[in-house]
Amino acid sequence: MLCRLLLCECLLLITGYAHDDDWIDPTDMLNYDAASGTMRKSQVRSGTSEKKEVSPDSSEAEELSDCLHRLDSLTHKVDSCEKKKMKDYESQSNPVFRRYLNKILIEAGKLGLPDENKVEMRYDAEILLSRQTLLEIQKFLSGEEWKPGALDDALSDILINFKCHDSEAWKWQFEDYFGVDPYNVFMVLLCLLCLVVLVATELWTYVRWYTQMKRIFIISFLLSLAWNWIYLYKMAFAQHQANIAGMEPFDNLCAKKMDWTGSLWEWFTSSWTYKDDPCQKYYELLIVNPIWLVPPTKALAITFTNFVTEPLKHIGKGAGEFIKALMKEIPVLLQIPVLAILALAVLSFCYGAGRSVPMLRHFGGPDREPPRALEPDDRRRQKGLDYRLHGGAGDADFSYRGPAGSIEQGPYDKMHASKRDALRQRFHSGNKSPEVLRAFDLPDTEAQEHPEVVPSHKSPIMNTNLETGELPGESTPTEYSQSAKDVSGQVPSAGKSSPTVDKAQLKTDSECSPPGGCPPSKEAAVAAHGTEPVSSPCG
């Protein structure tokens, strides 16, 4: 009985709870709340009597709240859709850019990536942009529908010719245009400039070829000396670095500090063994600079050796190749005569070159003018000294010739010079007529062959020039013309005289020919011509 009562009470309670809970109807678009998943409580449960009790203001507020709630739910749904769409968008674009960056790293890895030693590196690449690639990039940037595969192919074809950055890229362009290294072009232009300067300044006409070649050899030797010293220094420095790398195992052994026991042990071991001390070699490499291993004398010796032996090496190499090619097609029995003929040809060439050495001076440039033979009038002035004002640092062959005294000449000197030049010209032309030929026009060697005549006392008539202030040995133009006429008139009578008298007269005139010499003797003139003496050009 009690059990039945308990069962009835439980059923009543269950039915009461079931009446409170609403039935969930998803098809009810008005009362079903999709956000919470429950049914809204309806206000129509109490019957028509309760609906009549609700005021119209409360119903409008409930409708407004429902609209706001729905708006919030819709906004939340839109945001969730946008986020989902962005995730899908990123999931499609990330692989494209991942592959693009991976390609850049692969191309840069071939040339070298930055590390601890090189913080940053620069690379150069060419960008190839086609029309299809441009359209795919524009679609991606504008947010239109795009295809990941097409964009991936477009980005993969953009970068080509990936290479390291070079700050001297202009050299590449220069070589592409001209096909020549700029350094070689500079050296060729420098040589052309030297040739232009040599020709334009006419140095080759002022300086002898022998002097030019000598200077070229000296300059080449000095340049080779500096060149060989730098080469030897670099070789010594490289050897020094290699020795330091080989002494690396002794760093810990030789660099540590030793006390007196360690130094004593080192001395004991070095005294009882013939092995070299590695620490000595180690400290020599650390202290001695390689520059002290290349003295100038070593560079000088090597330069002189190369200056002499290098040309001989090339000559010997060429001669060996020539003999090898010559003997290749000649039978063995004829090789010995051919070698003998070659030896004779070389000896004859050397002999001919030695004989032709004196002839080479004609190619050395303009020779100096040989000393001119002294004319009879010049022997009268042999007390005058020549002085030369050289120019051109020993290369130019010009000088100024004049007397040892004052450079300026007086009127008598100019007159005497004009007379001397006219007479010398007639003498060399072969015109030896009695009208122009004088004793002072003959060479001294011819005059010395005649017997000497003892001169007599000077005539007082011949010293009138000294009293009037004129120079001895000179006469006025009037006296010279009169004397010439007198002599021309006396030539027939002189032709009848004996040869001995003529020679004596020539000897006497030649002795009076120098300036300031003795005047002709009156007795000698009378003995020669039988008439009174007249003025002569020499006195």
UniProtKB/Swiss-Prot annotation:
Organism whose genome encodes this protein: Mus musculus
Gene expressing this chain: Clcc1
Observed effect of gene inactivation: Embryonic lethal.
Function description: Anion-selective channel with Ca(2+)-dependent and voltage-independent gating. Permeable to small monovalent anions with selectivity for bromide > chloride > nitrate > fluoride. Operates in the endoplasmic reticulum (ER) membrane where it mediates chloride efflux to compensate for the loss of positive charges from the ER lumen upon Ca(2+) release. Contributes to the maintenance of ER Ca(2+) pools and activation of unfolded protein response to prevent accumulation of misfolded proteins in the ER lumen.
Residue numbers of Phosphoserine PTMs: S429, S433, S459, S498, S513, S521
GO cellular component term, pick one: mitochondria-associated endoplasmic reticulum membrane contact site
Site (Ca(2+)-mediated inhibition of channel activity): D25, D181
Subunit composition and interactions: Homomultimers. Interacts with mitochondrial protein PIGBOS1 (via C-terminus); the interaction occurs at the mitochondria-associated endoplasmic reticulum (ER) membrane, a zone of contact between the ER and mitochondrial membranes, but does not appear to play a role in ER-mitochondria tethering and is not affected by ER stress. Interacts with CALR.
InterPro entries membership: Chloride_chnl_CLIC-like
Low complexity bias (residue ranges): 512-521
Cytoplasmic topological segments: 206-215, 351-539
Protein name in the entry: Chloride channel CLIC-like protein 1
A Pfam family assignment: MCLC
Lumenal side: 19-184, 237-329
Regions of compositional bias (Polar residues) in chain numbering: 475-485
GO biological process, one term: endoplasmic reticulum calcium ion homeostasis
Positions of the UniProt region annotated as Disordered: 41-61, 361-410, 444-539
Presence of the UniProt keyword Endoplasmic reticulum in the record: yes
Similarity remark: Belongs to the chloride channel MCLC family.
MF-aspect GO terms: chloride channel activity; identical protein binding
Ranges of compositional bias, category Basic and acidic residues: 364-389
Protein location: Endoplasmic reticulum membrane
Notes on how activity is controlled: Activated by membrane phosphatidylinositol 4,5-bisphosphate (PI(4,5)P2, PIP2). Inhibited by lumenal Ca(2+).
